[in-house]
Amino acid sequence: MKKIFIKTAMASMLCMGFVSCADELNIKSVDPLNHQTYTVEELLAKQYATLGLTGQKGPADLPDIKSGDEGETGFIRSVFNLEELMTDETLWAYQSNDGMTQITGMNWDKDNPRVNWAYQRLSFDINQYNFFISEQSGSLSEDKIAEVRFLRALNYYYFLDLYRKAPFKDTFDNNLPTEKSGKDLYEWLDNELTTIEPLMAEVGAYNNSQNFGRADRGAAYALHARLALNSAVYTDGQIKDYQKAI
């Protein structure tokens, strides 16, 4: 009888030990980078990051856009390539770079990798902005949403400036984009900037170390002026909005 009691007691103690160990293993992550809630500034930082970063892990890993050189696919670099490298303002020594001789010689076509990288970057960024706007509208203040709408307009502006057309979407859903070109894309940009300008922060609101680089109303005014100054070019002479640049 004593042996049965001892065996039963020992088994019970072992079970209690297993339960205790199991409870101790059920712990939450203490990794400060692993969390599911984000501040407004963190959410906005991801949107602004599309202007400089090329992927999820820095210079070379998990790129947003597949290419032979991830560093070539960033917004600033890919747009700069198509805006400046064929002008007298730039002398590019590395002519062996992919597609470079066609760019600097003003003889590129749709198969040039640099033309494709810029196109894909603008499309990728716009998709990110559409997702943010869709998810956060009604949750964040209007001025924060207007900031991201400005970033989206900036990318559409470069579509207009570089390609004269864009695969257009201003929503995040499963529908395919439609093509807007010339006058239609110009008018959308004109209306969008007119709408968001009064919603954005006052000029100079972010001139401090905490918010340096964020777009305020002045950024929208500048983009709108640049759009208006080139209105006749973008619309084949159908619209001449030069007065809006004043």
Regions from the PLM with identified roles:
Residues L160-L162, P167, G204, N230-G237:
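Short coil/turn linking the two alpha-helices of tandem helical-hairpin repeats
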Residues M1-A9:
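Bacterial N-terminal signal peptides that target proteins for export
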Residues C21-I76, I246:
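Membrane-proximal, proline-rich intrinsically disordered regions
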Residues A45, A49, T54, E89-Y163, ...:
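Conserved, well-structured interaction surfaces
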